[in-house]
């Protein structure tokens, strides 16, 4: 189940739970991953080396109207739960007269931190469809908020799901999408006589130099795509025994 910020919980069927866990059973060997929400949209293609992730690079907006109810959707790039809380507070203040401010978010290159919130709508009719759109676009580091202004006519469970899903999709589609690299930091200390060898390895590995210190003991801090980090460490360590 998902536990909402307001104490609300979203329950999933046994079949949904099986789908959530299934993408990782094929290649989890040395470590365990948390349940994945791929059952709520198009399944995510598993990548052994997670060097890239998809996110949005700006705000997207969408509006959907059904039976006089208006759904205003906003997609935001985010990096932390703290930032999400600030944005939610701002939207609740801006739309103080709205009936519901529902949302879902996904965080982290591995898409391991996520939450959905129905904000008083019937269980699983708002937050879950919003999260499904985030997942079907394979996005992370994103918050989607859908504000509902009630039009006086009940939409029913099916109507609510369609409305929140459609509004979320419109906001996401109107946001600029980008792919970003997942990088890891590698630090190495060495005597000055090893300088040429170290710089040769850095160049061959296509690592980025973040910082250097060439005083008594030389130190270098590098950034490299995650899949090449261990290989870089091994090459640098071998220089010490060369």
What role is predicted for each listed range?
Residues 177-192:
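Short glycine-/aliphatic-rich beta-strand segments at the starts of folded cytosolic domains
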Residues 48-125, 229:
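C-terminal regulatory domains involved in ligand/effector binding and gene-expression control
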Residues 126-174:
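Active-site beta-strand/loop microenvironment that shapes enzyme catalytic pockets
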């Amino acid at each position: 189940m998902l536990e909402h910020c307001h104490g609300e919980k979203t329950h999933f069927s046994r079949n949904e739970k099986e789908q959530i866990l299934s993408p990782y059973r094929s290649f989890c060997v040395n470590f365990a991953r948390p349940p994945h929400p791929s059952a709520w949209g198009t399944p995510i293609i598993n990548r052994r080396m997670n060097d890239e992730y998809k996110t949005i690079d700006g705000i997207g907006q969408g509006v959907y109207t059904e039976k006089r109810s208006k759904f205003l959707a906003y997609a935001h790039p985010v990096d932390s739960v703290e930032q999400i809380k600030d944005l939610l507070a701002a939207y609740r203040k801006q739309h103080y007269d709205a009936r519901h401010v529902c949302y879902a978010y996904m965080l982290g290159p591995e898409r391991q931190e996520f939450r959905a919130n129905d904000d008083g709508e019937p269980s699983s009719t708002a937050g879950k469809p919003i999260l499904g759109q985030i997942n079907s676009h394979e996005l992370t580091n994103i918050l989607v908020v859908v504000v509902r202004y009630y039009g006086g006519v009940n939409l029913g469970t099916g109507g609510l799901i369609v409305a929140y899903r459609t509004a979320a999709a419109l906001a996401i589609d109107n946001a600029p999408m980008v792919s970003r690299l997942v990088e890891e930091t590698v630090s190495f200390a060495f005597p000055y006589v090893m300088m040429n060898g170290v710089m040769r390895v850095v160049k061959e590995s296509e690592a980025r130099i973040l910082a250097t210190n060439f005083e008594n003991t030389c130190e270098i801090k590098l950034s490299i795509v995650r899949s090449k980090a261990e290989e870089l460490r091994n090459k640098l360590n071998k220089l010490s025994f060369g």
